[in-house]
Amino acid sequence: MKVLLRCQRLRFIWLAKPAGRHFHRDPQLWAPLTLDDFEAINRCEKPLPKNFNFAADVLDQWSLKEKSGERPANPALWWVNGKGDEVKWSFQELGSLSRKAANVLTKPCGLQRGDRVAVILPRIPEWWLINVACMRTGLVFMPGTIQLTRKDILYRLQASKAKCIVASEEVAPAVDSIASECPNLKTKLLVSPHRWDGWLSFQELLQSASEEHNCVQTGSQEPMAIYFTSGTTGSPKMAQHSQSSLGIGYALCGRYWLDLTSSDIMWNMSDTGWIKAAIGSVFSTWLRGACVFVHRMAQFNTDTFLDTLTSYPITTLCSAPTVYRMLVQQDLKRYQFKRLRHCLTGGEPLNPEVLEQWKAQTGLELYEGYGQTEVGIICANRKGEEIKPGSMGKGVVPYDVQIIDEHGNILPSGKEGEIALRLGSDRPFCFFSEYVDNPEKTDATIRRNFYITGDRGVMDDDGYLWFVGRADDVIISSGYRIGPFEVESALIEHPAVVESAVVSSPDPIRGEVVKAFIVLAAPFKSSNREKLTAELQDHVKNSTAPYKYPRKVEFVQELPKTITGKIKRNVLRDQEWGRA
């Protein structure tokens, strides 16, 4: 029996009937194979197993359930590109193809367990294949977005000492221009229907690769992936995660925040270069046996997004607050989201007004979560619990979330301080292992018995967390501490404001004052700027404590953002203070 898989614009992959189990031969060495066991490990009710491999102990188990009829007929991966091309892979097909890909990485590419592989691919099925193939072979997966510049790629390859890079045609010229400066780089693997001098062809090698592959028996604490932090306050750090921190650590997230079952179809819009893609498009979703839905949108388009949401049976949606801000400006009541039942957001704070507008137009709640590359989801609004607009929700298991002062003392409810995680005698397995080659930065994340997030917040009497800002985003004016998010939330309530960013600006009397950079809605772009400035300032004074109003206002066409859509307040702040 053969299965035909249609892959991107007239490309096809033929594979034989999915092979049987090709992993841990000794059953006594298997990690726990039930979701209940993984969840119990997260709750600290069971010890972490000595060995664990996500491909063998999760994906291959869903493949067996699929084969025996214990899982619904949903695909494991459902990919579309809006041009009529579509890929649907079952867990069995994903298993067969990823074994072939594993053989490509270890044989023609010559990679060995522990080698680091930089992967710079857009949202295409091969990104998932390479990811799983790295799991099967014990290679360290290092994703990056295709928006990385030549300088970015050079930094990542040199800092990581990557042995191989897997990239698309868009990135190949930039890689070629700096490859000679990367002495550790031995192999360049191209994902493209075309050949490229100096590169191996992934498609050609995959066609001829064997499906027979024995999965490496990786240790639970063995390196699995390296994620480069967004670098809003300096050069990106390399946060290394273990097999278990990613592969087991998101079991409870999938149940309680994402609310997934094996019948669900999850559309997570995160770019492939960031850990949010790992959370929502790999680990949490596949731990639950759900379907990962992917749309290859080169750029976000509101019409395309809404058409996709109405045309496909998507049940669960996760996107950045920026997307929801754009969507609520549409008449959403015109659209019928047939199966959509659960909506999530994260990456930056969600303005309460957007949450309320989304619910008013769709009838659906919006569940915000807060986390970091280093430690995953820290707190979240969960189904069945009260949502307090503007709050990021309560701390999630296994974390003990606290607000502390600069000395590591726990602050009472309602007092602003640093968001921190209280630690026990052992470092939680779901933490990142380290910042690679940077022990000082790794050590700096711990203060007494707390992990320091670098963010400031407030916790109320019910344990709900309220975001104030990055520690270095907080504005101190005439002795008052002002968080940018509250001012931005007040501004967005005004119909003239599409988006805003609030930073400190030097002032000879107050030391620093609040300055707002504002993107105007189309109907207000021709307004008298002086009058509109005064109107917006009065609006903020009436919406929050008057001392927080922006004494300076600048109207801009767009705000500087990271590749993930986070506002780069540090760029605006440096511009104000003459450090740009």
From Swiss-Prot:
Q: Which reaction does it catalyse?
A: a medium-chain fatty acid + ATP + CoA = a medium-chain fatty acyl-CoA + AMP + diphosphate; hexanoate + ATP + CoA = hexanoyl-CoA + AMP + diphosphate; octanoate + ATP + CoA = octanoyl-CoA + AMP + diphosphate; decanoate + ATP + CoA = decanoyl-CoA + AMP + diphosphate
Q: Where is the signal peptide?
A: none
Annotated tissue distribution: Detected in adult olfactory epithelium.
- Enzyme class, first EC level, given as a word: ligase
Gene Ontology biological-process annotations: acyl-CoA metabolic process; fatty acid biosynthetic process
Q: What is its EC number?
A: 6.2.1.2
Entry binding sites for ATP? 229-237, 368-373, 455, 470, 566
GO MF annotation terms: ATP binding; decanoate-CoA ligase activity; fatty acid ligase activity; fatty-acyl-CoA synthase activity; metal ion binding; odorant binding
Predominant location category:
mitochondrion
Where's the transit peptide in this chain?
A: 1-22
Among InterPro entries, the record links this protein to: AMP-bd_C (IPR025110), AMP-bd_C_sf (IPR045851), AMP-binding_CS (IPR020845), AMP-dep_synth/lig_dom (IPR000873), ANL_N_sf (IPR042099), Mitochondrial_ACSM (IPR051087)
List the record's Gene Ontology CC terms alphabetically.
mitochondrial matrix
Keywords of this entry = ATP-binding, Fatty acid metabolism, Ligase, Lipid metabolism, Magnesium, Metal-binding, Mitochondrion, Nucleotide-binding, Transit peptide
Essential cofactor(s): Mg(2+); Mn(2+)
Describe the function of this protein: Catalyzes the activation of fatty acids by CoA to produce an acyl-CoA, the first step in fatty acid metabolism. Capable of activating medium-chain fatty acids with a preference for C6-12 fatty acids.
Q: Which family does it belong to?
A: Belongs to the ATP-dependent AMP-binding enzyme family.
- What's the protein name? Acyl-coenzyme A synthetase ACSM4, mitochondrial
Look up and give the organism this protein is from.
Rattus norvegicus (Rat)
Q: Which gene encodes it?
A: Acsm4
